[in-house]
């Protein structure tokens, strides 16, 4: 068995209709996966966080694996294979009330070849159903009888999971988390090595040489940060036809987990669909974001090259106006000090406190310069207040929330940004009816 990789990921795998999604929903304490008595309902991997006995880890739900050459079944198999590759513990769910099938044996073979730690969960053994003892011939060490519907046996499984994991460096989990994201071979690992000043990732011309998500800590201006270098996919594997799609899904998972995302674009290439999607996802999710243009040393430069590049990028994606753009060469460690300063700037902006009298002045100026009237009704913003949420959030107490158009909210956001530095931070505006 391979040593555990300290990525705190647990995958739920199995054939269709054995109760994987029911188990997943019970573990996370809410309905996330669709539960339906039909094979193939869960098509994509779904990630959620779990806390058990004070320990945090992530769990992945996957679609059912069967022996078939149907296209959608193959996509599910690929999804599950990726989940197996990136996880350190596998929960192999089978229907304990039925005989072992060829699909169960096929999955067992995949799991044995993965060399990962596997816990076999014989589900649906409630209501005094008879157990099929052939499950013990699957070739694994740990077997548990559970009922995902009623929760029986789940606690024992979770106890085993946290006992298998390495939580020695759990204090790092409380640090400010930065995810390094980007298309394979954009320079994610080179940037990680430059920031940590040590070789943590293999740097190669071959895309996808980072096989596991690598987590490191760095210090900038005496502040400690937790860095996640998103895993790639081996280009030589059978998953090659779907590399970009699944790399994107992994990037989205890392972005969800992070406090700040650094999205790397290769300066020598055109803006890819991959980068456009992940930047758009960061914007939609309102995630603090820095865009890094890497390999800038390879670009033939003129006086305004950097300015022109940034201008064109912002024209292509107008929604990134609040995201800073930093030009670097990770391999040659050029302009990394600039990137480090921007990281500190964004972190400070996220926790920026604003005195109420300054917000009151802003409120007066906004309504004086650009009052809003809609169908004869005048908008009156009575009060503005900043909350303590992780992302800068402002409550606007108004006389009539229904007449506020999104364009006026954009005007308010722009005014806030003109008054205060929120570089790299999304801004939430919440309308409240003034009482």
UniProtKB/Swiss-Prot annotation:
Start and end residues of each KH-like domain: 352-435
The EngA-type G domain extends over 8-169, 176-351
What is a GO molecular function of this protein? ribosome binding
InterPro entries for this protein: G_ENGA (IPR031166), GTP-bd (IPR006073), GTPase_Der (IPR016484), KH_dom-like (IPR032859), KH_dom-like_a/b (IPR015946), P-loop_NTPase (IPR027417), Small_GTP-bd (IPR005225), VWF_A (IPR002035)
Q: Which GO terms describe its biological process?
A: ribosome biogenesis
Transmembrane regions = none
UniProt keyword terms in alphabetical order: GTP-binding, Nucleotide-binding, Repeat, Ribosome biogenesis
* Gene3D superfamilies linked to this entry: 3.30.300.20, P-loop containing nucleotide triphosphate hydrolases
Flavoprotein is among the record's keywords:
no
Q: Which residues bind GTP 1?
A: 14-21, 61-65, 123-126
The entry's GTP 2-binding residues are 182-189, 229-233, 294-297
Report the sequence similarity comment from the record.
Belongs to the TRAFAC class TrmE-Era-EngA-EngB-Septin-like GTPase superfamily. EngA (Der) GTPase family.
- Job of this protein: GTPase that plays an essential role in the late steps of ribosome biogenesis.
Describe, as the record does, how this protein assembles with itself and its partners: Associates with the 50S ribosomal subunit.
Protein name as it appears in the record: GTPase Der
- Organism (species): Mycoplasmopsis pulmonis (strain UAB CTIP)
Q: Which gene encodes it?
A: der
């Amino acid at each position: 068995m391979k040593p555990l990789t300290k990525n705190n990921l647990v995958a739920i795998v199995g054939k269709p209709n054995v109760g994987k999604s029911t188990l997943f929903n019970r573990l996370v304490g809410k309905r996330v996966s669709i539960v339906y008595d039909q094979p193939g309902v869960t098509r994509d991997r779904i990630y959620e966080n779990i806390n058990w006995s004070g320990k945090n880890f992530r769990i992945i739900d996957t679609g059912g694996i069967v022996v078939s050459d149907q296209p959608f079944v193959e996509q599910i198999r690929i999804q599950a294979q990726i989940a197996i590759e990136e996880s350190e513990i596998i929960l192999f769910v089978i229907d304990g009330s039925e005989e072992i099938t060829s699909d169960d044996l096929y999955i067992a073979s995949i799991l044995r070849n993965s060399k990962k730690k596997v816990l076999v969960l014989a589900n649906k053994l409630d209501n005094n159903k008879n157990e099929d003892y052939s499950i013990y011939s699957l070739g694994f060490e740990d077997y548990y009888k559970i009922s995902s519907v009623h929760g029986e046996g789940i606690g024992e499984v979770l106890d085993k999971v946290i006992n298998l994991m390495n939580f020695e460096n759990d204090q790092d989990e409380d640090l400010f988390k930065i995810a390094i994201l980007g298309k394979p071979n954009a320079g994610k690992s080179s940037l990680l090595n430059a920031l940590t000043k040590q070789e943590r990732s293999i740097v190669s011309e071959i895309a996808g040489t980072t096989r596991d998500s690598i987590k490191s800590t760095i210090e900038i201006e005496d502040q400690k940060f937790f860095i996640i270098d998103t895993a790639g996919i081996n280009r030589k594997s059978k998953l090659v036809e779907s590399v970009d799609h699944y790399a994107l899904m992994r990037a989205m998972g890392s972005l969800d987990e992070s406090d700040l995302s650094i999205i790397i674009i290769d300066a020598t290439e055109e803006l890819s669909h991959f980068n456009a999607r992940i930047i758009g996802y960061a914007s939609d999710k309102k995630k603090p974001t820095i865009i890094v243009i890497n390999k800038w040393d390879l670009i033939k430069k003129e006086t305004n090259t950097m300015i022109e590049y940034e201008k064109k990028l912002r024209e292509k994606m107008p929604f990134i106006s609040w995201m800073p753009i930093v030009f670097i060469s990770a391999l040659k460690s050029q302009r990394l000090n600039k990137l480090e300063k921007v990281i500190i700037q964004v972190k400070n902006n996220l926790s920026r406190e604003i005195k109420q009298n300054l917000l009151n002045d802003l409120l007066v100026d906004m309504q004086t310069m650009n009052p809003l009237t809609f169908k004869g009704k005048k908008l009156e913003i009575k009060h503005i207040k900043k909350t303590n949420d992780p992302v800068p959030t402002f409550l606007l107490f108004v006389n009539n929330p229904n007449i506020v158009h999104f364009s006026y909210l954009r005007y308010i956001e722009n005014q806030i940004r003109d008054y205060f530095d929120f570089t790299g931070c999304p801004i939430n505006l919440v309308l409240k009816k003034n009482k």
